[in-house]
Amino acid sequence: MREKRCWKGRLIGALALSAGWAARVQAAPVLVDDFNTGEIKNLLGNRSNVFIKAPSKAMVSFREDTVNGKKSQVLMVRYDKRNSGGPFDSGGWCGYYTLLKSPAALVAPTEENPNPDPLPEQYMDGSRYKMITFWVRGEKGDENFVVGLLDRHWDKIGDSVKSEEIGKYLPAGKLTTDWQQAKIPLDEFFLDYSQLASVAIVFEGDLFPETGHAGMIYLDDLALE
């Protein structure tokens, strides 16, 4: 009987230890941006903006809308993706990005250290998150894009690992004029999750293979969960 109680005690202790380990591994969701500040800067304090290469182009602005039953300020991304002209006659590129990494920063000199080294850039440790989530809708419902994610390696190269087309991660199977929450598992991106640099909305040329495409999408509540 005593041996049985000891075995039960060890089992309960192991389960408690396992539960505690799981609790440490699962990080609380982090809201990267809710777009309510009206600034081209996310809630992490890092830069956000469009990226463009002519002849393609993109711009962002803010709009009032109702998302999931709540009034909210949302991000509008307007794009015009061309399929010819520019480098390699590929039509250039365009999209929107927001930084997850904190950029390098200067350090104020002191009497003791008049020439301090700058603080290095700090990549986000996303290894305890499981997915990227955000709310999205299209202006007409015929829009399309992929999500790009960068770690330190891809950040240095200046490119990203891409998701599948956004419809794969939406309840309706495609963008519509209604708000839907996209849920993109991080394991869709084969990279170093402990050194995340940025996340991007990318309008790829092969999404619109015939003539390119111009349109508008709206985003809200971009998060890591």
Where are these regions (language model features)?
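Bacterial N-terminal signal peptides that target proteins for export
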Residues: R2-I12
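Coiled-coil-like amphipathic alpha-helices with heptad-repeat character
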Residues: E3-R5, A19, N42, A58
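Bacterial N-terminal signal peptides
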Residues: I12-G20
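Beta-rich carbohydrate-recognition modules and glycan-binding surfaces
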Residues: A27-E225
